[in-house]
């Protein structure tokens, strides 16, 4: 197959950052996706509807005039989030979910939740107003090996949470293990999962074998080849529980190529091309539209996009680096050749 036309896709998990970084991040996401769920882990985090509305306006100010891109906002849950804020979020018209970060699990998560049971009252409210919960599913216990933190989170936290709140819609974000795939497959339909391009493309050998590759360092950390294959099978299966979420998370080149480098991969400039490469490698391009354009929207109860994109099998080279505020960001596959690219955007 040399060409494929899709309903314009959405990104159900991305980081746009703020301030001088927005011109870069918004343009790169808007070039491919019609909507994107924007993570709230700024400094300070987006914990109120008022803050979310202000951030929404800052993002919209950088949407190219040729684009219909719509940011879908989230609230950052803390142990002191008022119940009224949950109700206000549900009625806001711009907030589609609340995000649970275990405190210290990832970038700018220090204000996150230390004890999940401390927010059970908030989760009851979210369940009653049907506001989805997005979860970074890793424990932060230093005694737990970093490669086991997702699996331990499932056992300690997620399983009891799903049993306690059977009507709460939950997205298990950026899953990275076979254990997570199996859990999602067995869970009720109220639970879905996003899968990133980098967890499909790489495993921990790519990160650590021979030399350390800081631009492959992310959280959850890359796992085994067996985990990678389970994720590929899930993404390309056509099962609506699994949908696209890039977790595109830019850091400046100096922060990535550092003695203490930041976790996060900037895959936005080539995201849909990367997914196309993966699906093509599995002879599953016919399943790409479901994963990229249908299943996430259906999970959130949102209409499908009324525009299309066409991807063509034609080599192109990813930039070595890109302007990022007053700095540079190195995109995933920098300087390398990819086989798929967007040809056109078509509006019905």
From Swiss-Prot:
InterPro entries given in the database record: DHOdimr, Dihydroorotase_CS, Metal_Hydrolase
Record's keyword annotation contains Hydrolase: yes
BP terms from Gene Ontology: 'de novo' pyrimidine nucleobase biosynthetic process; 'de novo' UMP biosynthetic process
Catalysed reaction equations from the record: (S)-dihydroorotate + H2O = N-carbamoyl-L-aspartate + H(+)
Keyword terms: Hydrolase, Metal-binding, Pyrimidine biosynthesis, Zinc
Active site (record annotation): 247
Residues recorded as bearing N6-carboxylysine in the entry: 99
Transmembrane parts of this sequence: none
Pathway: Pyrimidine metabolism; UMP biosynthesis via de novo pathway; (S)-dihydroorotate from bicarbonate: step 3/3
Cofactor requirements of the protein: Zn(2+)
Similarity comment text for this entry: Belongs to the metallo-dependent hydrolases superfamily. DHOase family. Class II DHOase subfamily.
Name the UniProt record assigns to this protein: Dihydroorotase
Organism: Coxiella burnetii (strain RSA 331 / Henzerling II)
């Amino acid at each position: 197959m040399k060409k494929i036309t899709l309903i314009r896709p959405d990104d159900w998990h991305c980081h746009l950052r703020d301030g001088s970084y927005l011109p870069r991040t918004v343009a790169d996401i808007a070039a491919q996706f019609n909507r994107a769920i924007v993570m709230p882990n700024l400094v300070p985090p987006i914990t109120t509807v008022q803050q979310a509305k202000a951030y929404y306006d800052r993002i919209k100010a950088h949407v190219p005039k040729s684009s219909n891109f719509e940011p879908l906002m989230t609230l950052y849950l803390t142990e002191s989030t008022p119940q009224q804020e949950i109700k206000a979020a549900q009625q806001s018209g711009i907030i589609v979910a609340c995000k649970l970060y275990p405190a210290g699990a990832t970038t700018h998560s220090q204000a996150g939740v230390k004890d999940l049971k401390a927010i059970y009252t908030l989760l009851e409210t979210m369940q009653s107003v049907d506001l989805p919960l997005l979860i970074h599913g890793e424990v932060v216990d230093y005694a737990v090996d970093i490669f086991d933190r997702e699996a331990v989170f499932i056992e300690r936290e997620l399983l009891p949470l799903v049993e306690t709140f059977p009507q709460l819609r939950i997205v298990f974000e950026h899953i990275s293990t076979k254990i997570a795939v199996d859990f999602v497959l067995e869970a009720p339909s109220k639970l879905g999962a996003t899968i990133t391009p980098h967890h499909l493309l790489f495993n921990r050998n790519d990160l650590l074998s021979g030399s350390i590759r800081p631009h492959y360092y992310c959280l959850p950390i890359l796992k085994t080849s067996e985990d990678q294959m389970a994720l590929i099978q899930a993404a390309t299966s056509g099962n609506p529980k699994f949908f696209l979420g890039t977790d595109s998370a830019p850091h400046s080149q100096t922060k990535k190529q550092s003695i203490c480098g930041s976790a996060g991969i900037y895959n936005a400039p080539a995201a849909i091309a990367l997914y196309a490469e993966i699906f093509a490698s599995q002879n599953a391009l016919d399943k790409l539209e479901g994963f990229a354009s249908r299943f996430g929207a259906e999970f959130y109860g949102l209409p499908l996009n009324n525009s299309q994109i066409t991807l063509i099998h034609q080599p192109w080279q990813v930039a070595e680096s890109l302007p990022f505020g007053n700095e540079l960001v190195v995109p995933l596959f920098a300087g390398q050749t990819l086989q798929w690219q967007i040809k056109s955007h078509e509006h019905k």
